[in-house]
Regions:
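Canonical phosphoinositide-binding patch of PH/PH-like domains
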Residues: 126-149
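Phosphoinositide-binding peripheral membrane targeting modules
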Residues: 62-123
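Pleckstrin homology
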Residues: 143-163
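N-terminal non-globular leader segments, chiefly Sec-dependent signal peptides
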Residues: 16, 20-21, 116, 120-122, ...
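Hydrophobic, Leu/Ile/Phe/Ala-enriched alpha-helical segments that form helix-helix packing faces
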Residues: 43, 47, 106-109, 155-159
Length: 163
């Protein structure tokens, strides 16, 4: 979900990450073992004094992230810098890229085969690409979709402003 009402601090992003960690644990899974004070300091160190304009939390890890963590946050700062933070039981990493360095912004609106529910369901993804890297934002429900579209609009406007 993306938060747009005002700018967020590193501590506010930490609170969102902590809430997402609780939500990322299914009823048949063991709870995540995160050192929350250490995570708070890592997020503070990563963001410094930067203010975050948009925050999207992927409830389900995109393909390619599975071995690294349980969920990720994609942030857009007020200065148009993207942070992709992956958080797991004893894992934290982040990538940083300026919106101006993105080679391509790709939005995919399609259907996926939900084998658990035995039906096709809609999904929306935004792929932020630079070099060999791609940062993915996923939306599987209507609330996430509208938030994800807001993120895509903000990145597109910053990357390709109308003149």
């Amino acid at each position: 979900m993306i938060q747009m009402a005002g700018l967020m601090s590193a501590d506010e992003i930490f609170e969102r990450a902590r809430n997402a960690a609780a939500a990322a644990t299914g009823p048949d899974e063991k709870a995540m073992k995160i050192d929350y004070p250490a995570l708070k300091e890592k997020i503070r160190a990563a963001l410094g004094e930067r203010k975050v304009a948009l925050c999207h939390i992927n409830k389900f890890l995109p393909e390619g992230y599975e071995d690294q963590g349980r969920f990720n946050l994609v942030l857009l700062t007020a200065g148009n810098v993207v942070f992709d933070m992956v958080i797991g039981d004893s894992y934290f990493r982040y990538d940083v890229v300026s919106v101006s360095q993105l080679d391509k912004v790709q939005l995919i609106d399609a259907m996926w085969d939900n084998r658990e529910k035995r039906r096709e369901e809609p999904f929306l993804s935004v792929r932020l690409m630079h070099g060999e890297e791609a940062h993915l934002l996923l939306a599987l429900d209507d609330e996430e979709r509208s938030s994800l579209l807001a993120f895509a609009r903000a990145v597109s406007a910053a990357r390709n402003p109308e003149r």
